[in-house]
Amino acid sequence: MMEIKLKNNILKQTLFLAFTITFLSCKNDTKNSGKGINDIITNDTNSSVINIEERSFPKETDLSEYPKTEFITTLESKINTSKNNVYCVTMLYAWNEVKNIVNEPFKIDSNFKHLTLLNNSSSFKDVLNPDEYIISSEIDGFNIKAKAEFKKSLTFQTELNSYKDGLKFNNEKVASFGITGIYNYEQLKIVSILYYKNDNNFIIKLHPKDSNHEIILFKSEKKFDKMNDINSEIIKLIVQGKEDKQNENIKWKYDILEEDEIIIPKFNFNIETIYKDLTGNTFDTKEKSYTIERAWQRTAFILDEKGAEIESEAEIEYYTEEEDPNKPKPKKMIFDKPFFIMLKKTKSQNPYFGLWVANTELMSKN
């Protein structure tokens, strides 16, 4: 939420930008679960936003309670890879609504680098259909409010396996889910390998029931500065993966074999923040000067699989001796080190949600 005031002899206005309530949910359907995040409480196909029951999310917590996590407002924002970084498109949608309200050219002081970055970003375009989010605005005297709201549930057709204490991320035990081997054909249909070099460099895709959306997970030893750099790398490697599949010697990398494992941490958080580096920023039109009084955003995200509870612990051994790279061997695609998650439309180049995972702060613990 932003308030904007005019200064000196120029007309004074206040602008509230409410970058609000972003719900992202990736959770399986369960036949006897009762109402929860799994439920889509609407039969109206024309409804602009899917109604997700909020009680499945934890209570809102201020970002200051998460010292190892940061929010970013654009894909072009620089990320601190030693911390978790959370991005969602609602901030850009709300700012775009402000520009529509002002509806005339304006200037931003070059010292306001965050606001300039927000204003120049175009990575929000076409990442969601118009009926998948709500943009609203209100003008009350000299006060202007702009709000962007987005709620989305991505459910899976079939439960994946749930592993209690089955994963160590940076040597800390966390709850996890995934698949092991080829024992359940319905589970295999949910997971695709888009790129595989080795157990530390790969991309997988999770297929929700809504085939217009996809969940991409990327583990890499390469260093990145921005999420759009990560996205560009993913696009490039997916092309490489398609080429690899045509090579008879290595196409085994793209099949899930009997001894393969895919294990992913569970996430459950509901975080709000005020962007202090946007507070007090100004931009000027010919006759008006606007000052941002408050910029607020809340993002809630669940990535969780309620499959059969299995008491097991994954141990991974890494071998240093040279091996034939073309010889099939078990793939251990285990997200136990920093990695990237993004949610996007299948036909869109850019994601509407991105999460750089550097530590366990946002993960579910048992």
Question: Residue spans of the language-model regions?
Answer:
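C-terminal motif of bacterial Sec signal peptides marking the signal peptidase cleavage site
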Residues: 24-25
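Conserved GHKL (Bergerat-fold) ATPase module
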Residues: 17-21
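Bacterial N-terminal signal peptides that target proteins for export
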Residues: 3-15
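Hydrophobic-core positions in well-structured secondary-structure elements of globular domains
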Residues: 31-366
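Generic hydrophobic alpha-helical membrane-segment signal
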Residues: 13-16, 288-290
